[in-house]
A protein has these predicted regions:
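Amphipathic alpha-helical interaction segments
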Residues: 34-37, 51, 67-70
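Non-DNA-binding regulatory cores of transcription-related proteins
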Residues: 78-145
Length: 145
């Protein structure tokens, strides 16, 4: 089981989406609120922009795919999401911003959290001069047997 995301308080109640956005320095616009509710009011999850766009459209909200992409990147810059690049051009956004890794279920592309302390990464190369390693993402690919 992975660590709780910072969006969840100790007593398992949720911070309201409006409060979460304000604390991150973002104005709670209609679009941000609609997308934020889907992302943050519930269990931690992994979504693509296309999946989130389909979900918000299914609720009758009119939010363009470009706005979904822009909002996800705003949430990421504000520290509310992590972005995971899988399969080159496919990006997932993770509401659990704690230090953890992932299982990738092939072929459907579903991501599942691995607890932060379940994998130990050793023997990393020295980064080039003037650079530092900020994060290592491990994706363990799974297939049904």
């Amino acid at each position: 089981m992975s660590e709780k995301s910072p969006h969840h308080m100790e007593d398992a109640t949720l911070v309201t989406t409006s409060d979460l956005l304000r604390k991150a320095g973002l104005r709670p616009t209609r679009q941000r609120m609609a997308l934020g509710r889907l992302l943050f009011e519930g269990a931690d999850r992994h979504v693509t922009a296309e999946q989130l766009h389909a979900e918000v459209a299914g609720l009758g909200e009119h939010v363009s795919l470009a706005t979904v992409y822009n909002t996800l990147h705003q949430f990421k810059r504000a520290g509310l999401l992590r972005e995971l690049a899988i399969e080159g051009s496919k990006a997932y956004f993770d509401t659990n911003t704690s230090n953890h890794n992932h299982f990738l279920l092939e072929p459907n592309g579903e991501l599942m959290d691995i607890a932060g302390d379940a994998i130990s990464v050793e023997g990393l190369p020295e980064p080039p001069e003037g650079m530092k390693i900020t994060h290592v993402d491990v994706v363990v690919r799974l297939a049904k047997i």
